[in-house]
Amino acid sequence: MDVKKVNLFSNSKIRKINPDWFTAKVHMAEISDVIGSKEQNIYHVYFENGAKTKLHVHDGNQILIVTRGNGVLETFSKRGRGKENFGIRRTKKIALNLGDVAYIKKGTLHTHGSADKKRLFSHIAINILPPKNKKYSTTWYESDFKTLAGNIIK
């Protein structure tokens, strides 16, 4: 079949996720497997009660499309040469509102999620697979979101 579709708001396949990647409760619906996409991983991500991602970096580009609520995307610069336990400094804080589309270049240290502790925030995440290894990789860090990125979360 040349075309497959899925409704974002139907009962999609729920992806099991590591809760250590987030600050509070998050659900992730799988889209790419349902439609058979091989060039990118696509998820519909729901952040409850002010939840956001832990600090992380991808080896491929990422696109976020806001589908509900108000969120925030923050980028950081790295201070130091270590793979773990290095200093950070916030470089951008960007409001994410319904309909917004954000492009995050590979290698950008960042976090994103809900800006409201009382309302649900959701977005589509499109992770564009790197052409060389065809596997998208994300490195997650413990962090205070201000000055320090700590240990890598396994």
What annotation goes with each model-predicted range?
Residues 44, 57, 75-77, 114, ...:
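Residue-level recognition of conserved beta-strand positions in structured domain cores
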Residues 59-83:
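Glycine- and acidic-residue-biased ligand/ion/polar-headgroup-sensing regions
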Residues 41-58, 106:
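Conserved short histidine dyad/triad with adjacent acidic residue
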Residues 63, 103, 118-139:
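A short hydrophobic beta-strand segment most commonly corresponding to one strand
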Residues 78-107:
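Short acidic-glycine-tyrosine-enriched beta hairpin
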